[in-house]
Amino acid sequence: MSVSPLSPRMRTTLRAALAAWIVLLAFTLLAPSSAGPDWVIAHLAQALQGLGLPDVLTHPRRVENMLNVVAFVPLSLLGSLLWPRPSWRDWTAVGFVASFLVEVVQAVALDARSATHADVVANTLGTLIGALLGHLVWRILGPRASEGGADLPDRHASAEELEPPR
């Protein structure tokens, strides 16, 4: 079996960052009121307008959609750095299911929130982007890790190649 090129300290840091991001997302996405997210959207839209960006990019609905994409990037990025064996397709599927479940909870249990299919699409896109970024990081770290004697797990290795040396 391959040795992870990530130090134990780095793995602990990534786990803590992932846990913190999950808590922040749960607090934001499952809050009974949309006042917090609406405040962030309004202020970010205003800040983007202040930068001189065109109205088509600073409309609150466009900003909300962008934030829905960005919110899910860290989940699959951090997850794929911690657990590189699942492919970007696996992480994207996990993101789709998680986003779908969030929207179901918003539709069924949170009267002040609105569930939309556009949010599921945006969150899934964010998960895909994060997973691809994680894959890219592993591709970059791969040759460096191999030089140090540590190898990245091969997603397509045969069972014999994955067995430890005897």
Show where each model-derived region lies.
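Non-cytosolic membrane-interface motifs at loop->transmembrane helix junctions
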Residues: 113-125
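Gly/Ser/Thr-rich beta-alpha loop segments that engage phosphate groups in nucleotides
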Residues: 128
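Bulky hydrophobic segments
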Residues: 1-113, 131-166
